């Protein structure tokens, strides 16, 4: 009479076939990992690996810049400017939104204005300006914000439009110049190849951003992180001035994510793979329960006697 002892067969299977047991455990762990990963792709938005840079990563590059607002710089009245970056902002944005990438390469520099946090930290010798400063202007190269290739040598003009005027009146009020924080409108003027080709952040309009009646702008020098920590770094850089820092807060809407259809397809493939692995493990487990005792082990059993089998057949 044929009888099955599942627990005994399973014990013998585990003790007699260690490699297969390890294989079953590994396959089970892989199936669970694929199942978990598939569920993760189903419920979580994943950043697209095809897009190396979006506007979040691009604007974060400016966080490493130090801007020096020197006390010795000459103020420039904006009414004397005939071609300011702010005056061409609207047309530049229109070109960027309506033309193809190839056309943009031939159309010259474009202007994009975004809101950003700007802090100005005056050093002790800094006494401020007698006129109302409403605009800060600087020019950098692409490599100063970590761009590579052809864009590393591209010139980027930066104009900060302050929401309120910045002058020495604040310094006189407190007895010294204190750190100020502005939500400024930053206008970037550069070749189209410098900017990411993803969804742009909300734009601000520099012409209507400041409520000051008299506009003055001042040129600032920029220093990147590599220059800051270089051996030839000048400790007296911006000694009689104010150091400006740019801060960009991550905007989830600017991150390029994997489309829902692609995520569903990835989840389906991972689920099918995990199901196949689970079926494989269950099959091996059933084999261990039903026929787990090796044939050699049965032949070595003292109750097994070939002579008795031969006599019984006779």
Swiss-Prot record:
UniProt-listed InterPro entries: TMEM248/TMEM219, TMEM248/TMEM219_dom
Lineage, top ranks: Eukaryota, Metazoa, Chordata, Craniata, Vertebrata
Biased composition (Polar residues): 80-102
Entry keyword set: Membrane, Transmembrane, Transmembrane helix
Family note: Belongs to the TMEM248 family.
GO cellular component: membrane
The protein's name: Transmembrane protein 248
Cell compartments where the protein resides: Membrane
Membrane topology according to the record: Multi-pass membrane protein
Domain of life: Eukaryota
Region annotated Disordered, chain positions: 78-106
Membrane-spanning ranges: 21-41, 179-199, 236-258, 270-290
């Amino acid at each position: 009479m044929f009888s099955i002892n599942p627990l005994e067969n399973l014990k013998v299977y585990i003790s007699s076939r260690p490699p297969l047991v390890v294989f079953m455990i590994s396959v089970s762990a892989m199936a669970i990992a694929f199942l978990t990963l598939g569920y993760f792709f189903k419920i979580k938005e994943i950043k697209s690996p095809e897009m190396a840079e979006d506007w979040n990563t691009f604007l974060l590059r400016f966080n490493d810049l130090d801007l020096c607002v020197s006390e010795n710089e000459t103020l420039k009245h904006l009414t004397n400017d005939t071609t300011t970056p702010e005056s061409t902002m609207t047309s530049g944005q229109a070109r960027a939104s309506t033309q193809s990438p190839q056309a943009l390469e031939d159309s010259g520099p474009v202007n994009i204005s975004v809101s950003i946090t700007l802090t100005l930290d005056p050093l002790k010798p800094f006494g401020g300006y007698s006129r109302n400063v409403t605009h800060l202007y600087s020019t950098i190269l692409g490599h100063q914000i970590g761009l590579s290739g052809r864009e590393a040598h591209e010139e980027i003009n930066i104009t900060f439009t302050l929401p309120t005027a910045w002058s020495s009146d604040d310094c006189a009020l407190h007895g010294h110049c204190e750190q100020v924080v502005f939500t400024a409108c930053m206008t970037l003027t550069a070749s189209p190849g410098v900017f990411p080709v993803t969804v742009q952040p909300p734009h601000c309009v520099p012409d209507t951003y400041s409520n000051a009646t008299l506009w003055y702008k001042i040129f600032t020098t920029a220093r990147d992180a590599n220059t800051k920590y270089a051996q030839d770094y000048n400790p007296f850089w911006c000694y009689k001035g104010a150091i400006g820092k740019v801060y960009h807060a991550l905007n989830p809407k600017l991150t390029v994510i994997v489309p829902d259809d692609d995520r569903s397809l990835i989840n389906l493939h991972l689920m099918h793979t995990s199901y196949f692995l689970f079926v494989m493990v269950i099959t091996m487990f059933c084999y261990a329960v039903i026929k787990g005792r090796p044939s050699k082990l049965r032949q070595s059993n003292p109750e097994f006697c070939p002579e008795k089998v031969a006599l019984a057949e006779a």
